[in-house]
């Protein structure tokens, strides 16, 4: 099973991003696959980011942001997952001395995806997802699947 990270979707949403074309191409390459998992937590992050004027020069209005996210929820070939019983482990990790506070969302996302059987994870930040038990974590904008 394969999942993709928030950053790829945000790049695909932003026509001004240098990564836009490559991100769109990667996501479109997954459209007909039956082994894709989309996590609601990831889509929640997408919604927050594409509405944020600190991230996008022209943020999406609420209804357009929801419609953009709904497109990822509506692919009938893809599994949509919401949550998993991972929070005890997330809190254990978060309590570690050198745990960066912003990693808590990544930890929850990674552990949720692993709970649902995801083995391959595409992200532009592979180092942020190392150590969570994925078979492969890679940046599809710089290396092939």
Residue ranges: model-predicted function:
Residues 1, 107-145:
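Acidic, PIN/NYN-like endoribonuclease modules and their adjacent C-terminal/linker elements
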Residues 1-38, 53-64, 127, 131:
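Short, well-structured N-terminal submotif of metal-dependent ribonuclease cores
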Residues 8, 42, 86, 108-109, ...:
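Alpha-helix capping/helix-boundary segments
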Residues 10, 24-27, 47, 69, ...:
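Conserved protein kinase catalytic domain
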Residues 38-44, 104:
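Aromatic- and histidine-enriched alpha-helix N-cap/loop-to-helix transition segments
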Residues 48-80:
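Helix-adjacent hinge/juxtasegments
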Residues 53-57, 99, 139-141:
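Short, hinge-like loop/turn segments at secondary-structure boundaries
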Residues 77-124:
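Active-site neighborhoods of divalent-metal-dependent phosphate/nucleic-acid chemistry enzymes
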């Amino acid at each position: 099973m394969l999942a993709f990270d928030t950053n790829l979707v945000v790049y695909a949403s932003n026509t001004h991003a240098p990564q836009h074309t490559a991100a769109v191409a990667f996501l479109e390459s997954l459209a007909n696959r039956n082994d894709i998992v989309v996590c609601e937590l990831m889509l929640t992050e997408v919604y927050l980011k594409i509405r944020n004027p600190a991230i996008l020069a022209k943020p999406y209005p609420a209804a357009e942001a929801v419609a953009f996210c709904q497109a990822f929820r509506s692919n009938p070939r893809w599994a949509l997952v919401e949550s998993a019983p991972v929070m005890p482990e997330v809190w254990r990790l978060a309590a570690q001395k050198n745990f960066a506070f912003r990693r808590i969302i990544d930890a929850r996302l990674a552990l949720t995806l692993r709970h649902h059987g995801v083995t391959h994870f595409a992200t532009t930040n592979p180092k942020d997802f190392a150590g969570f038990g994925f078979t492969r974590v890679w940046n599809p904008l710089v290396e092939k699947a």
